[in-house]
Amino acid sequence: MFRALNCDDHGAAVQQNAFGFPRKSSDRWTDNSTSNYRCESGGNGRDSGRNRVRRPMNAFLVWSRDQRRKMALENPQMQNSEISKQLGYQWKMLTEAEKWPFFEEAQRLQAMHREKYPDYKYRPRRKATAQKSHKLLPAASSSMLCKQVHVDERFYPFTYTDSCSRAAHTRMEDQLSCSQPMSTARSLLQQEYHSSSASLRDSPETLAAQMSADASFYSK
């Protein structure tokens, strides 16, 4: 007998599908109260997006519900974003007395929503944030970085003994273009410092004193 009932139920279900009356998704959850609440409240699952419980409408949404439909019929070529802007502007122009009936209707809808979904909590969807790209600095950024390199005598004390060393340092400053990074600029400045120190040791006064000392030594 039990098998016969199952066959009858199966035949009725097949007949229902044959006539084009598919079963609703909510009918599959009527045997379990927990599953029924899960279906209504938009729990985990593939159908959670379609069964998501919406927030109760506020006063503006109550007012704009009919106004949006009316404006869309009067202006079929107008985009939805433009309609929203126009409705927002019109809502601001209304007086408090004109808005009050819609506030009352919104409070009534909120009370009904609390009775129907006592465990409802508003969970806003997180907006997708664009990932930060880790790329090299462009040419403009490197040029700004080069501008921050300041030649200060406290860090690089140059000593000019003649016009040749001054001209060499002038050429070095021309080489510090904005296309070079800061590390390259520092290394070039250090090389110039060492070359300036070497030129200081080999200055004309030092060479003349050395030559006079050698001449007096060989004359003896």
Curated annotation (Swiss-Prot):
DNA-binding region: 53-121
Pfam families, A to Z: HMG_box
Chain spans, region Disordered: 25-52
UniProt cross-references to InterPro entries, sorted A to Z: HMG_box_dom, HMG_box_dom_sf, SRY, SRY-related_HMG-box_TF-like
Example GO molecular function: calmodulin binding
Taxonomic superkingdom: Eukaryota
PROSITE patterns: HMG_BOX_2
Predominant cellular place of this UniProt entry's protein: nucleus
GO cellular component entries: cytoplasm; nuclear speck; nucleus
Residues of the signal peptide: none
GO biological process: cell differentiation; male sex determination; positive regulation of gene expression; positive regulation of transcription by RNA polymerase II; sex differentiation
Protein localization: Nucleus speckle; Cytoplasm; Nucleus
Function: Transcriptional regulator that controls a genetic switch in male development. It is necessary and sufficient for initiating male sex determination by directing the development of supporting cell precursors (pre-Sertoli cells) as Sertoli rather than granulosa cells. Involved in different aspects of gene regulation including promoter activation or repression. Binds to the DNA consensus sequence 5'-[AT]AACAA[AT]-3'. SRY HMG box recognizes DNA by partial intercalation in the minor groove and promotes DNA bending. Also involved in pre-mRNA splicing.
Family label: Belongs to the SRY family.
PANTHER family: SEX-DETERMINING REGION Y PROTEIN (PTHR10270:SF161), SOX TRANSCRIPTION FACTOR (PTHR10270)
Quaternary organization: Interacts with CALM, EP300, HDAC3, KPNB1, ZNF208 isoform KRAB-O, PARP1, SLC9A3R2 and WT1. The interaction with EP300 modulates its DNA-binding activity. The interaction with KPNB1 is sensitive to dissociation by Ran in the GTP-bound form. Interaction with PARP1 impaired its DNA-binding activity.
Protein's recorded name: Sex-determining region Y protein
Organism of origin: Canis lupus familiaris (Dog)
